[in-house]
Amino acid sequence: MEIPSQEIHIMIDNTISRRKERKTNLADAEPIVLMSVLSSLHAGYFRISLSLCSQALLWKIMVHLHSELPSMAYYLLWYLALATQVSLCFLYAFKCIFLFDMVKEEFSHYIGVNYLYAPSISCLLLLQSAPMIEPHSVLYQTLFWIFAVPVLTLDTKLYGQWFTTEKRFLSIMANPASQVSVIANLVAARGAAEMGWKECALCLFSLGMVHYLVIFVTLYQRLPGGNNFPTTLRPVFFLFFAAPATASLAWNSICGNFDTIAKMLFFLSLFIFISLVCRPNLLKKSIKRFNVAWWAYSFPITFLALNSVQYAQEVKDHVASVLMFIFSSMSVLIFISVMLLTAANSKRLLRRDHVLWSSTGPKDK
């Protein structure tokens, strides 16, 4: 008589080990996510804080001139700009530590190198719009030098390359983003003038304006560098009127009044703005898909609005008041629109920008 064999299956509950494995996977995933964010981040993201800081400066001036405007909006905007700037600075500092090779690659890129000025510009604007620091205080002066020294250092490196390095002539490397370096010097000049350092302000202003004229003439000739500018970055064309608008602001602070030179620079920026607005096809392809470059629409308009405010204060007629109202309203509306679009497209915000990492210069393609 045969006894039927029976198989006994023993099931071991390994939920504890699975939980440990899941925790380990999450712990391993967190550094991967951070490194992914850092690898996607570049200095062009400081366009966001640049827009916030310039908007805070506009609101500071407007609240001072028109007491009926809510001062709470200015304070909230300034603290939002501060939080954004600090966050971006920390992230970019981590990138410099962990992904320094990518930072060097960005420094070598004919477009990316210009946005290395953006953190300093944002900090200088944040300082000038600060509600609690007086321009003549020691803290203001100390922070000014901390933010201005990187600008002068980059000037020495970048401008020197244009006439000493064999493969990096301005005629080859020039592109609309090259005007960011000019804006950095002019914003620093305004900051120095606010402290009463007239000689320092004139030095920075002359440095910025000389290079602006050279860059503007180079770009006006449509040399090879401009033809290599990517379509997705065409919002950066708004820098064409941002540079003379910033120069007008700086000269107004140096002289203490909106004189003839300041008016000429304002009219130049106004003319270039109208010229760009009359050519919507130039920007049509760049707005098909969201890109962080869209923030380049915001801060140039804000600089133009700041100019219109100063112009209205000097001229005091109906046309000047209408210009101030139009550009101030336009600045706020564009700023809010871009901010809402950024929130709606947050998943696309930190995608790797293949434009900036595709080549180191026009001749490298």
Swiss-Prot record:
It is a multi-pass membrane protein. It comes from the Eukaryota. The keyword Signal does not apply. InterPro entries: SLAC/SLAH, SLAC1/Mae1/Ssu1/TehA, Voltage-dep_anion_channel_sf. Residues 47-73, 128-131, 190-199, 257, 313-321 are extracellular. Pfam families: SLAC1. One of its GO terms (molecular function) is voltage-gated monoatomic anion channel activity. It is found in: Cell membrane. GO terms for biological process: intracellular monoatomic ion homeostasis. The keyword Hydrolase does not apply. The chain crosses the membrane at residues 26-46, 74-94, 107-127, 132-152, 169-189, 200-220, 236-256, 258-278, 292-312, 322-342. Keywords: Cell membrane, Ion transport, Membrane, Transmembrane, Transmembrane helix, Transport. GO terms for cellular component: plasma membrane. Residues 1-25, 95-106, 153-168, 221-235, 279-291, 343-365 are cytoplasmic. Slow, weak voltage-dependent S-type anion efflux channel involved in maintenance of anion homeostasis. Belongs to the SLAC1 S-type anion channel family. PANTHER family: S-TYPE ANION CHANNEL SLAH3, S-TYPE ANION CHANNEL SLAH4. This is S-type anion channel SLAH4. The gene is SLAH4.
